[in-house]
Each structure stands twice: as structure tokens, then as C-alpha cells.
Amino acid sequence: LYSGKNSSCAIGGIKANIGHTFAASGMASLIKATLCLHHRFIPGVPQWNAPKTELLSGNELYVPVESRPWLIQPGGLKRHAAISGLGQDNVCSHLILSEVPAELRQKVEVAESGDLSLFPLMGQDMSTVRKTLADLENDLQSGKDPAALARKYYEVSKNTDAEFSAVLIGATREEILKEIAAAKSGIENSFSGKGDWSSPKGSYFTASPLSREAKVAFTYPGGFSAYVDCGRSLFQMFPGLHELDQKFLNETGPADKRRGSNYLCELLQERRLFPRTMERLSNKELDALQDDFIHSPIAMFESGVSSAVLNTHVMREGFGLEPQIAFGYSMGEISMLYGLGVWDSMSNMSDILNTSKLFSERLAGPMNAVREAWKLTENEFRNETLWGCYTIRISVSEVQKLVDKEAHVYLILINTP
């Protein structure tokens, strides 16, 4: 079970999560491992920093500092969990669990529980919106359960033709009350023509709604948009995403003789998004990992496209949103086509990316396309930066005057005012 290499097995302990349970620790560990398999989720180890030095030599294990999704790894078909226990009488026990077959698992697209509650507050005008806001405030202050209130206000929102809707979001009673306090002035300012109101938490109101007949558009940004820690809680909130992993394997089969992958964990670049280490990484170390990610264009592109597929699935299957319009830019067109199912096999994309020289030699690495265009010799600019992109915050006309004086400087993108 532990013979894999390259940090293949996560380790943790129940004591770190819930404290010392004494004689009940064995049962608590069994429950934790079972829940990990059921939810396909690896919980983080709180307050972890580093192991004792003698444990650092092995490379089979890692400690998840933050919780993360548990994806099927290359060569595997199911997940396994092991429990080791030592009783007060020094008797050791060891138990290995495996997840149930996919056909026996209950399909759940959206998790029914979570930290955040969402409150849609409807009204025909400013006074009725503010009254609904005050009603929610009174309900919370009287001790009513926030989750039950969220369900109540959601049901009300489905059966009204009110023109305006304020949406509040929060994890605790205190957070929601703070959102209400901020919304009072925000809603009034919006009705006064001072623009839409939004909070850092995600609460929102506009006095200029698009109406119920408005169409939905999906926008796909540049393909190179992934980053370390991207989408960490997505699988936990939307368990149905795990079915995509099985879908890729069933539809494409093993990628034996190809350089591409049909495993979601590899297409998503899981190990880059959620690093596996025995020690807690510093901000400087995380920045270095992100810098390496940015300079690995194939990995970055595969991860960006895969993330777009996951988020599109969430919008369509989790929220029931179907776009009437979709568009992508800066290679986001690729994400759009895969995300909306126009193209099927992402493993074929992976194979092409990993066998083509486009992102390994032509536009990245030695950048031979640039060398040929500029007629550079093989040894020129080997130890210097050959190509760089910069953002300049001055007028287009000023930039163009300077660009015209240079042989190898180009104005390639102009943002709108």
C-alpha cells in the first residue's frame, strides 16, 4: 500500500482534527477514513509544520496541510485508505478500506451542506427590498437557524415576480448580519444611481437588473489561467465532478503508447495545484512553485482547460444554467469547445500538446520561432531573456512612438479605456 513513489500516500491523524479521544480513537479513525473514501476528500492536518528530521528521507508519504480533493491516480481504478492503531495495551491494529464500485455510489451533483448560506431577498422597489432585509435581520437576531432561513428565502424567491433581488452570502450568523449592515447603504446607493453594490464576501445588488428574460453567456478567459491552490474546494462543494474522472477513463481507455493522459488528476495538474510535501511551504516557496508553473506552458494550458471543463459542468449540472452565447479569447476558445462538449476527448488534446514542439521548442524553451524570425544564431541569448511581455500604463500613441524606434519591440495588446 505504501510502496509508491513521489509522495503517493497522504498521512494524517484523528487527534489533529478532534483531539485525544482515548479509547474511542480507533473508532474515530475508522469513521474518518470511511468519510474520506465516501466524500473522496483528504482533510488537512491542522497546525502542521514539519516532521522529525528522521522522517524526511522517505518520498512515499506527504502531509496535506490544507484539505484537498482525492482524485484517482494514474494506474489506479479506486481509492484505498489505511488505518493504523496502537491500543493502551500496546496491541497494534491495521485495517485497509476500499471505496465502493461507482455503480453503487449515490450520485450527488451539489453538496447539501457547507459553510456558506445564500439569501435571495426580493422586492418590487427600494422600500420592499429594504423591508425584506430588515425581516432577515430580525429573524437572525431572534436566534433562528441561518441555514433554515436560507432555504425559506430561496423558496420565496422561486415564487415571486419581484423586479429586484439582493443576494447575501455568509458562513455564520455574525457574518450575515455584517453583510446586512453593509447592504443597507449599498442598496440605497445603487438606487441613487451610484452603481452596483457588492461585498468582499460576494453579496450583490443592482438597481438595473437584466430581467428574467436576459440571456446567459459563458466567457472563457485565456487558457493559461491556472494557479497553485486553484479550485481546492470545488470537488467538495460539487461531488458530481468526480464522475468526470470515471467518464474520461471509460471513454478513452488507458493512454499506454501516448505521451498524453486521460486521468483527470494529470490533466488538471493536481500536484502543481495542490503540492505534496512533508513540510508546510512558506509563501516564498509557494511563489517559486507558481513561477515554475507559469514557465511550464503545456502543464499550465492542460490545467486551465481542465479547470474550465469542471467549472462549466458546475454551472450546467450543478446550477442548471445553459448558455445561449459562449465565447473565448486568448486560447480560451479551446476551453470553451471542451467545456461545452463540442470536442470530446481531452486526452487527445493532451497527447497533441505533449508531442508537438509548439510549446516545448517553438514558442517556449529555446523559442526557435523567435530565433528564426530574428535570424539569431543558436548561441545568442542563451543565458539572457530572449522574449518578455510588459504592461505599460500610458497612452497608445506614446507607446507606438517608442515602439517604432525599436527593431524587436511590438505592441501586441491594447486594453480598452
Which stretches of residues belong to each language-model region?
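Acyl-CoA/ACP chain-elongation machinery
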Residues: L1-S67, S84-L86, V110-P120, S127, ...
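Conserved phosphate/anionic-ligand binding catalytic regions in large, soluble enzymes, centered on
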Residues: H20-L37, A82-L97, Y220-D229, A326, ...
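Short, intrinsically disordered, charge-balanced linker/junction segments flanking boundaries
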Residues: E54-S57, I412-P417
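FabD-like malonyl-/acyl-CoA
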Residues: G123, G170, D196-Q400
